[in-house]
Amino acid sequence: MSKSRVCYCFFIFLISFSFNVYAESSFIDALTGGKIDFGIRLRYESVEDDSKASGNRDADALTNRTTLGYKTGSFHNVFAHIEFENVTDILDDTQYNDGENGLTALPVIADSRGTEINQAYLGLKFIDKTTIKIGRQALTPRKAPFHRFLGTVLWRQNWQTQDAVIVTNTSFKDTEIMVGYIWKNNTIFGTDRDMEAPIFNAKYDGFRYAKLEGYYYDLDFTESADLANASTTYGLRAHGVIPVINDKTKFIYTGEFARQSDTGSNSNSYDADYYLAEGGFKVKLNNFVTSILVKASYEVLETDKGTQGTVFRTPLATGHAYQGWTDNFLLTPAAGIEDTYFTMVATGKYDTKLIVSYHMLEAESAGFDYGDEIDIWLTRKLNKKYTVGLKYAVYDASSDAGNTKASDLSRFWAYVGYQY
């Protein structure tokens, strides 16, 4: 063999060896150079539910939520994320109904015990400004707490996730488009629900005083117990902030409309609407209270025929954020619901926040009131990693004839959390 051929072969070997070493090194770097996420939330919850029989109206729970996850770095535009979640009941879980233990005579505290894989997905970035995620993941097209149609139910200890393939693209200026397909909903109770659900969400932020969102969610639940939730929803949302007087005072607004109809094997034929209108002001201050937001809101979930099967429903939402924190209206009543409510958010120094809201809840298609609710939440962050909070919600039922929510209900929480 000639010296030139020997040199050539040796050169090819060197390149191949170097590439393999580099590839292996890059893979190891991506695998080990990721980010760990770790969180703990210890929480006490107390409930008084007058709809239960005497002697079974009070319930208490002390639970702890622990999450441990890891997101790898990118290797040839591929990355992965896995997260484990554990919910432990520190007291006796026979003191409340967690939604899975069968203690239906007791008030509900929806924090069931268990350990599970909360998220596990593969991410791909082969196309510019496009991310594909395949696997179990948290879907939140909107920032918390505005998860009206898709959310994680992040207030509960066991979060909701979806098994899905999701494509997100930001190629167009000021535009984010999300297209996906969900085949399984993993609930807060540790159970799952099969579905065939193409989804679409598009947001545009190019206007100075308005942000626009359009969406289409075709949630075809396929198991017999969930067929009433099979629905197609499409809608539009606009919200924005407009300076008034000076940059320290701003007008805030939101307007939203959605229409929903039955789909798949849902035996209930219906068409129902959703709409939201709200406006208020946010003012920046220069004392202990750094800002105050006040707003008035009006939200309606219609019923088509006055039956439970023909109401506007949101089965994948973070329902806790709507119609009051007592969770009395997670399922839209047969008569629909109108919620007129007022909210005050005060932000202070030392990462302190106070939220107070007052709800006036009425039937949408009948002439009676459900009741009123007052919600109060005080929270503070410490060193950016620790959070402490107190939260109280009380529902005062109306005595109107026909009221299907005629029992008083109150909840109290105290919690401390850590997030790394």
Whereabouts are the PLM-identified features?
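Surface-exposed loop and membrane-interface regions of Gram-negative outer-membrane beta-barrel proteins
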Residues: 45-64, 72-121, 126, 139-156, ...
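One-face residue pattern on beta-strands with alternating periodicity enriched for small/polar residues
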Residues: 37-41, 65-69, 119-123, 133, ...
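Envelope-exposed proteins and targeting segments
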Residues: 34, 116-118, 161-163
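Outer-membrane beta-barrel biogenesis signature
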Residues: 13, 20-36, 305-318, 325-337, ...
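Signature for the C-terminal beta-barrel architecture of outer-membrane proteins
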Residues: 128-132, 152-307, 342, 347, ...
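Bacterial N-terminal signal peptides that target proteins for export
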Residues: 1-8
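Outer-membrane beta-barrel "beta-signal"
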Residues: 408-420
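Transmembrane beta-strand segments of Gram-negative outer membrane beta-barrel proteins
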Residues: 26-49, 76-82, 175
